[in-house]
């Protein structure tokens, strides 16, 4: 992962990957068909690790607003050089050119939307959230908002701190989910 996040997958040589993995280039090519394959499998491995950690953390938090805040904190980049987000950016750049990459990425994003949907459903059930018209639409829209905030952060605009992007995301969530935040006539 370090090589990819340091220079980008297009700048990394297979020999460099093999050297870091203590393998030959032939061995790397035996397991991976291309550098893109290495990128996607690295991202999938990291997302699997992060999903387990996120779900364990969220399970320990009481209160749906606190869970949502923590979810947002897990989603957004820690810094403008967040290695996982760099992997996502590398993969996103390939998605418009490959339906296979797009489907692969959709499968990686699904657990995020599922976790968000579970928080929203729990919040509605507890009366802490106003029910959105459709939870799936809300999760798609909210994850898109988080992606946009993440991109702003990754552009290395230092005036846009992590605390500020989390605050902006929570404000958007409150605007849609907080009781009294919406008209009663839909």
Predicted regions mapped to residue ranges:
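Short coil/turn segments at alpha/beta junctions that flank glycine-rich nucleotide-binding fingerprints
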Residues: 6-10, 61, 126
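Hydrophobic/aromatic-rich alpha-helical bundle segments in the mid-to-C-terminal region
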Residues: 102-106, 110, 124-173, 180-186
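Short alpha-helical functional segments enriched in proximate histidine and acidic residues
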Residues: 3, 49, 78, 115, ...
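Hydrophobic alpha-helical connector segments
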Residues: 41, 52-85, 135-142, 166
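Helix-turn-helix
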Residues: 2-37, 41
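Residues in soluble alpha-helical coiled-coils and helical-bundle/repeat scaffolds
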Residues: 33-37, 41, 59-63, 79-80, ...
């Amino acid at each position: 992962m370090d090589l990819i996040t340091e220079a980008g997958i297009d700048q990394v040589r297979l020999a460099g990957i093999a050297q870091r993995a203590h393998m030959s280039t032939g061995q790397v090519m035996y397991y991976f068909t291309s550098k893109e394959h290495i990128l996607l499998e690295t991202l999938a491995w990291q997302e699997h690790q992060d999903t387990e950690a996120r779900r364990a953390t969220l399970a320990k938090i009481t209160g749906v607003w606190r869970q949502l805040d923590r979810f947002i904190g897990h989603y957004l980049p820690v810094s403008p050089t967040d290695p996982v987000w760099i992997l996502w950016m590398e993969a996103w750049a390939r998605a418009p050119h490959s339906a296979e990459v797009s489907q692969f990425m959709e499968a990686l994003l699904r657990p995020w939307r599922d976790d968000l949907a579970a928080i929203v459903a729990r919040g509605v059930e507890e009366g802490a959230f106003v029910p959105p018209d459709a939870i799936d639409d809300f999760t798609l829209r909210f994850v898109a908002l988080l992606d946009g905030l993440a991109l702003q952060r990754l552009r290395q605009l230092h005036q846009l701190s992590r605390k500020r992007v989390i605050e902006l995301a929570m404000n958007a969530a409150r605007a849609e989910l907080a009781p009294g935040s919406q008209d009663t006539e839909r």
